[in-house]
Each structure stands twice: as structure tokens, then as C-alpha cells.
């Protein structure tokens, strides 16, 4: 049964009760450092593998990842250096291999264990594209190794490592931008064309397709943004649009990023957006990692009551 506040907002949108430990991980067996958010209570917990946006770092998402982890999930956020999108996907695959080898166990608090059978992947901006690319490589379950990684075409790869991805979420994903570092495109512009077998949630922002200050290119241009990622996802898939917010409004306060920000004069705050995204993650995880779909169903049916901000539209495609 869904738990709600007195005003009807679901408790998934509030910080959970779990005490979270933040762990910086550097290892010769890793292709890059990690920022890990771990519950501290004894037990086994699902894993979120989260990829940051272009020119950002996991520290920019601390509030969001703390929110998610406080509901008893382990969040693993690689710290990518400045690299091409193709190299970023390759690095993400190496981190996934590290997880599948159960090496995360050694860095977690005592008696805290990762449930490698319950893994979700996600990311923001170009990190969202990286998450989709990883799921397209591993999510099809093709033991022969057929995968779609960065070009939008099916290519034969080596046998994939045994990492089961159970859920995929994109926060304002961007497939291709003005930078040469984001030159490849996984989109095919065919509905339901992504070759994956995992449930998908796409969270978009309504202002991310606009020019910043009337001069700078949009952060998430039409045709390569959240709408097209959702359009190409196979059911079950979900779409949530935070229409009054911009591409970087979910970052922690103090992040100085050029781009369109939220509309002024609205009662909603950036903190409310972070709460909303965190709550959507938690509800989606409950549904597809733990088999408890009540929260997600109620949010979809009554977003105006259950959510801290206006989500419009909210779309659910089950089959």
C-alpha cells in the first residue's frame, strides 16, 4: 500500500529513513573512480549505476543520489574524465564488468551487500544516452553478443558479461549535441526500435529544447532529446515531463551551468524537482526491482496529487 503525507504527496518523494554512507572508490581494477552511496543497515540492496552529464561530475547529483539511496538502494556513480561519447560507453561497460565480478562488495560497509540480480542503469544528459547504450548492449539477453551501442546499428560484439539489467531510466537524455565529444547517435527514429527487454522510464524537462539567452544552442534539441528516447523505447515504458524546468535544474545548488533554467515566478523550486526525480526513481525501482507497483500506479493515475511539481504529460505504455 502506498504511503502518503497528509497533503497526499507520496512518501517516495521524501528522503527515506536509511542512513547513507558516501564512499569514494579508486582502484587499479577500475577504469575510473567511483562515488558510491550505500545504506548502512545490514542487508542486501539493489544497485543503481548512474552516469553524470557532459562536463559534470557525480558530486553535482549528491542530493538526488542521497535521496534514492536513503530508500535502501546502492547508487554507484562513475567519475568520467572528458572523453568522447564512444569512449564513455566503453568505460561504462568496464564498470559494469567490475560490478558483475562482485568487486563492489569489498568497498561497502560491513554486512552490506549488493544484489547483483537487481541492477538499474540511469544517467542525465549524455549520461542518459550512455545508460541507454549500456542497456542496449546488455539488456537484450543475446548470448551471441548482438548489441546496439553507439551508432544506432546492430553490430556483432564479443559475448557479453553476466550483468542483468532490470530497469533503465533517463533524466533528460541527449543523443547528440553540438560538441564533437557527443558525435555518435543511438537513435534510429523508428518507434519502439530499441533492442532491449527492460522497463524504461524517461524524465524530460520542458525548457531544455530552448536556446539559452537567445544565443547558445539548446541543451537538449528536439529530435535527439527525451521525447525521441521515449518514442523508441519498447513497453513497458513511462514518460514524465517536468514542463517548467530546464536541463540542469536537478543539479545541486551552486552548480554554475549555462543553459535555460526554470521559469521565474513559479512556486516550484529546484529542490522540488530533485525530490520529484528521486521519488520517481524510488517508485519505479519498487515496481520493477521489488515487484511493488502500487506507488508507481498511483503516481501515474494522480500526478497532480502525488507529486511535488507539475508533470505534464505523464504517459504509461504497458504493452
Regions found by a protein language model. Name each.
Residues 74, 79-83, 174, 245:
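Short beta-to-alpha linker loops that shape the active-site pocket of alpha/beta-hydrolase fold enzymes
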